[in-house]
C-alpha cells in the first residue's frame, strides 16, 4: 500500500472520512441550536414581528408550538447566549397576549416599540438621565393636555 492511499478496509482513514454517529448528532444539535438562537434573536426586532404578523405566521398553531419550544432559552444554561434579552419578553408576549400579536400587524406600533427600545438602550446605564427623560415626557404630555382642554387623543 502506498502512503496516503486510502482503502475501504483501512479503519483509520474511514473514520476520518465520515463522522461518527455521535459527531453527526452533535453537529445536528449545534445547527438546530444556532437556528433557534438566531430566530429568537430576530424576535427582538419589532419590524420583523410586524412581518410575521402580516404573513399570518403569528396565528399559525405550529408556529405557536415552535414559540413554546423556544422557552428552553429561559434556562441559565442557554440564556447566556442571547445578545438581545428583550427577545424573551417579546417571546412571552407572543405566546400569551393575543392583543400584542394583533398590534404587531400595525407598522406604527412596530415603530413605537422600536423607539422605546432605542430610548431604553440610550439610558439604561444612566438612571438619572432616564428619570429626567421620563419627567420631560410627563411634562410634555401635561402641556399637550392643557392645549387640548384636558382631552387625550
From Swiss-Prot:
Q: Which domain of life is it from?
A: Eukaryota
- InterPro entries linked: Med31_sf (IPR038089), Mediator_Med31 (IPR008831)
Give GO terms: molecular function aspect only: transcription coregulator activity
- Which Pfam families does this one have? Med31
Location in the cell reads: Nucleus
What is the similarity comment for this entry? Belongs to the Mediator complex subunit 31 family.
Q: Which protein, by its recorded name, is this?
A: Mediator of RNA polymerase II transcription subunit 31
The primary gene name is SOH1
Amino acid at each position: 500500500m502506498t502512503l496516503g492511499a486510502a482503502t475501504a478496509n483501512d479503519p483509520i482513514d474511514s473514520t476520518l472520512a465520515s463522522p461518527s454517529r455521535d459527531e453527526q448528532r452533535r453537529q445536528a444539535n449545534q445547527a438546530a441550536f444556532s437556528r433557534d438562537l438566531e430566530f429568537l434573536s430576530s424576535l427582538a426586532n419589532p419590524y420583523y414581528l410586524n412581518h410575521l404578523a402580516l404573513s399570518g405566521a403569528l396565528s399559525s398553531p405550529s408556529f405557536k408550538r415552535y414559540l413554546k419550544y423556544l422557552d428552553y432559552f429561559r434556562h441559565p444554561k442557554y440564556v447566556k447566549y442571547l445578545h438581545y434579552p428583550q427577545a424573551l419578553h417579546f417571546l412571552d408576549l407572543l405566546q400569551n397576549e393575543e392583543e400584542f400579536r394583533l398590534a404587531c400587524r400595525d407598522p406604527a406600533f412596530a415603530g413605537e416599540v422600536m423607539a422605546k427600545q432605542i430610548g431604553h438602550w440610550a439610558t439604561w446605564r444612566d438612571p438619572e438621565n432616564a428619570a429626567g427623560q421620563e419627567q420631560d415626557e410627563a411634562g410634555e404630555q401635561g402641556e399637550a393636555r392643557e392645549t387640548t382642554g384636558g382631552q387625550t387623543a
